[in-house]
């Protein structure tokens, strides 16, 4: 079998690795694979669309692949440059380089009949083709910049997309900076702007609200004393969600909407408890409309450094807030006199370069109406990216039509889309690793069975929103593990010792956990769990944090699931007892049998 992989980012590299390794885990012949990358190095967005001081918002423990870890276990978040270094090391470790063709642009993918494909590529001005049996599209979500249509955009002296941002020097001297977009990149650039001595003012524009979520568990002060076991190095949030009763042993009626609703209310209550607001972590303004906050799922912005500068003018100073914060309060940075103005989305920019904002009911809109006209000198479009597949023929589907876990379309299994889902909390690379495990098994006819219909892991999409491919990271990873029989049970974890069992139950949903059993089981998985990952449970959390997590997990997921499982058991027993009684009562007695015989 021959397979082409398009794209040399994390998703493409992990796809290449599993295709090359398939014959070591399954009884199949070695697969011939070629990876085509248009740039001159691997890494994708992390190599070419990043900036100074850029840091991943997903933890190193979660983002790195199951069988190759970052060398420094004390590091929680990698810089973009460090992550590219990690990916290059991944290529070294698994011998991927001979199968990677850099500076090679895929011009066209077309079908040649009998289920095969032809890849047309260009390199150094030369065009060539490569025929194959399957194609893995791993070109990524962050390639083509999304440019909003705003009349008068060209009337601002300096305008550029965030993909072009490299250094704070680009924001100029003594400038009024406006950032469009409240995602991680937009918030990062706003933070760099407000803390730079070279800029005059910083304004961030949002469409219709956003939600801030910390990427680390907040450090808490109880009666003025910090309680964290590791001050300044709190546990990443994406490692804090336990596996037991959140993913494993969850009743079907709890999983999905009910589980998410309970979890959301828990998050809102926790946010109020430590920051005084339920809108988001220390988020006093810019919240989503109530109907969207309560009924739809949303993507958290995990870049929190800018939020204190936005919230400062809006924080409550009521006696309730003062009392609460004197008892319990998240540790927040001192912003001094610096602030970031929050504004609605621009409607248009007039001939004088003055921005006219859309009117809405948000408090920031009312504040702007009372202030002077705003004329930006620098405008940064942190408006994300759009999906584009110019190389695909018209008879190929796109990821939004891939109905099998977002990987392939039914009936067209030889074309896989890897890494085209976006988690709210989590990371794309580990989900891509789980997706490719499923796709490769299906490709070689080793999938345990048909994929069970299950959309509980999907996030509800906002009809007016740009992103419609959101998933809950932990639920999706667990679902993919179930698909291939790689989700370990309690007893399977226990077979590897108590340390693995503790991490299985209380640790985050990390892919190494899914290498304990199943078709991709790997003997090195228990060692990584014991040497590195167990520390996220036993070494990084205080007694208060562990007890709080146990109690909240039991309340939100554990108790409802246990009660429902018991109810199912009682119903099943009742049915069996009723059936047994019915059978007994329907049998003729011995006397009745004798009378019947005499009559005969």
From Swiss-Prot:
Pfam families per record: FMO-like
Superkingdom in the source lineage: Eukaryota
EC numbers: 1.-.-.-
Keywords: FAD, Flavoprotein, Monooxygenase, NADP, Oxidoreductase
InterPro entries: FAD/NAD-bd_sf (IPR036188), Flavin_mOase (IPR000960), Flavin_mOase-like (IPR020946), FMO-like (IPR050346)
Record carries keyword Flavoprotein: yes
Pathway in which the depicted protein is active: Secondary metabolite biosynthesis
Swiss-Prot/TrEMBL cofactor(s): FAD
Function: Monooxygenase; part of the gene cluster that mediates the biosynthesis of the indole diterpenes penitrems. The geranylgeranyl diphosphate (GGPP) synthase ptmG catalyzes the first step in penitrem biosynthesis via conversion of farnesyl pyrophosphate and isopentyl pyrophosphate into geranylgeranyl pyrophosphate (GGPP). Condensation of indole-3-glycerol phosphate with GGPP by the prenyl transferase ptmC then forms 3-geranylgeranylindole (3-GGI).
Recorded family membership: Belongs to the FMO family.
Name the UniProt record assigns to this protein: Monooxygenase ptmN
Source organism per UniProt: Penicillium ochrochloron
């Amino acid at each position: 079998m021959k397979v082409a992989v398009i794209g040399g980012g994390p998703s493409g590299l992990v796809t290449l690795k599993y295709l090359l390794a398939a014959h070591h885990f399954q009884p199949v012949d070695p697969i011939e694979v070629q990876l085509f990358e248009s740039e001159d190095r691997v890494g994708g967005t992390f190599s070419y669309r990043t900036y100074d001081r850029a840091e991943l918002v997903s933890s190193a423990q979660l983002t790195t692949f199951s069988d190759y870890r970052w060398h420094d276990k004390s590091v929680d978040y990698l810089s973009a440059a460090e992550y590219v270094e990690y990916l290059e090391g991944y290529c070294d470790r698994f011998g991927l380089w001979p199968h990677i063709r850099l500076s090679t642009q895929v011009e066209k993918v077309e079908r040649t009949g009998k289920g095969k494909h032809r890849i047309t590529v260009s390199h150094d001005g030369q065009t060539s083709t490569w025929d194959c049996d399957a194609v893995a599209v791993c070109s990524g979500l962050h390639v083509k910049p999304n440019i909003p249509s705003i009349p008068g955009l060209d009337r601002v002296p300096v305008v550029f997309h965030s993909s072009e941002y490299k250094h704070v020097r680009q924001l100029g001297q003594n400038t009024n900076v406006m950032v469009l977009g409240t995602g991680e990149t937009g918030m990062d650039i706003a933070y760099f702007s407000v803390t730079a001595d070279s800029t005059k003012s910083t304004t961030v524009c949002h469409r219709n609200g956003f939600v801030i979520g910390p990427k680390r568990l907040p450090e808490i002060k109880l009666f003025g004393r910090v309680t964290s076991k590791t001050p300044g190095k709190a546990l990443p949030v994406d490692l804090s969600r336990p596996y037991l009763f959140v993913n494993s042993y969850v009743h079907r009626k709890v999983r999905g909407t009910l589980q998410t609703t309970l979890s959301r209310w828990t998050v809102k209550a926790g946010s109020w408890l430590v920051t005084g607001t339920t809108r988001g972590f220390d988020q006093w303004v810019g919240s989503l409309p109530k109907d969207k906050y309560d009924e739809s799922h949303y993507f958290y912005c995990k870049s929190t450094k800018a939020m204190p500068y936005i919230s400062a003018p809006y924080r409550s100073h009521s006696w309730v807030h003062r009392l609460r914060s004197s008892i319990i309060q998240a540790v927040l940075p001192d912003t001094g006199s610096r602030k970031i103005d929050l504004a609605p989305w621009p409607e248009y920019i007039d001939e004088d370069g003055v921005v006219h904002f859309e009117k809405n009911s948000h408090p920031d809109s009312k504040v702007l109406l009372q202030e002077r006209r705003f004329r930006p000198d620098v405008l940064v479009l942190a408006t994300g990216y759009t999906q584009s597949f110019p190389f695909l023929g018209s008879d190929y589907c796109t990821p939004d039509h891939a109905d099998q876990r977002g990987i392939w379309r039914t009936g067209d299994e030889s074309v896989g889309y890897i890494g085209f889902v976006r988690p709210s909390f989590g990371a794309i690379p580990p989900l891509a690793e789980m997706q490719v495990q499923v796709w490769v098994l299906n490709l070689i006819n080793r999938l345990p069975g048909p994929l069970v219909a299950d959309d509980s892991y999907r996030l509800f999409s906002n009809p007016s929103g740009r992103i419609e491919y959101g998933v809950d990271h932990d639920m999706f990873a667990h679902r993919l593990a179930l698909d291939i029989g790689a989700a370990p049970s309690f007893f399977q974890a226990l077979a590897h010792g108590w340390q693995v069992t503790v991490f299985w139950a209380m640790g985050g949903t990390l892919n190494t956990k899914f290498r304990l059993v199943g078709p991709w089981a790997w003997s090195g998985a228990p060692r990584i769990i014991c040497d590195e990952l167990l520390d996220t449970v036993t070494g990084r959390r205080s007694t208060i944090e562990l007890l709080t997590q146990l109690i909240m997990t039991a309340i939100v997921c554990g108790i409802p699931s246990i009660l429902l499982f018991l109810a199912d058991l009682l119903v099943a027993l009742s049915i069996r007892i009723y059936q047994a009684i019915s059978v007994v009562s329907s049998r003729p007695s011995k006397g009745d049998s004798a009378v019947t015989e005499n009559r005969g």
